[in-house]
């Protein structure tokens, strides 16, 4: 597949995440897809394949994204090649106290045979994100 087709795959993946269409998301991923998140995040580190017992992005963010505003990722393709796509997107959330997080993320995605094979995310301000999530966990515990 070429760059144009890979871009379409990635944009469809972002649409499936925004719509909370887990089946469509899984259909667009290789069965042994790799995800790489900053290690300081609750869902940080590397994982391969379908979700296991470790915390996932979905475990963390679905409760913090009750509406379309928080779910909107505004993906913008920055670069694309024969097997990689770079996308700038927004991570948004709101906690029970009404505190909001809205930060940019740069994702490097490998697309093979029309499916996502590897994703690595780079947050611009991981410290602010960790602080927001820690405060959110504190709110949930009280």
Regions found by a protein language model. Name each.
Residues 21, 34, 124-125:
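Poly-acidic low-complexity segments
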Residues 1-5, 58-142:
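A beta-strand edge to alpha-helix "cap/lid" segment located at domain peripheries
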Residues 10-13, 25, 33, 49, ...:
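Hydrophobic pocket/interface hotspot
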Residues 1-31, 135-142:
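Short, low-complexity N-terminal intrinsically disordered segments enriched in polar/charged residues
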Residues 9-19, 44-47, 64-66, 88-89:
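Short, mixed-charge, low-aromatic patches
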Residues 24-26, 30-83:
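A solvent-exposed, acidic/Ser-Thr-rich amphipathic alpha-helical stretch
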């Amino acid at each position: 597949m070429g760059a144009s087709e890979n871009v379409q795959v990635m944009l469809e993946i972002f649409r499936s995440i925004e719509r909370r269409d887990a089946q469509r998301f899984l259909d667009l991923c290789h069965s042994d897809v790799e995800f790489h998140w900053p290690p300081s995040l609750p869902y940080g580190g590397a994982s391969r394949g379908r979700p296991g017992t470790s915390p996932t992005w979905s475990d963390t963010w679905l409760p913090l994204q009750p509406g379309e505003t928080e779910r909107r990722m505004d993906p913008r393709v920055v670069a694309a090649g024969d097997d990689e796509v770079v996308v700038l997107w927004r991570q948004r959330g709101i906690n029970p106290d009404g505190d909001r997080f809205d930060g940019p993320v740069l994702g490097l995605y490998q697309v093979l045979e029309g499916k996502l094979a590897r994703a690595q995310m780079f947050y611009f301000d991981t410290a602010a994100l960790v602080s927001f999530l820690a405060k959110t966990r504190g709110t949930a515990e009280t």
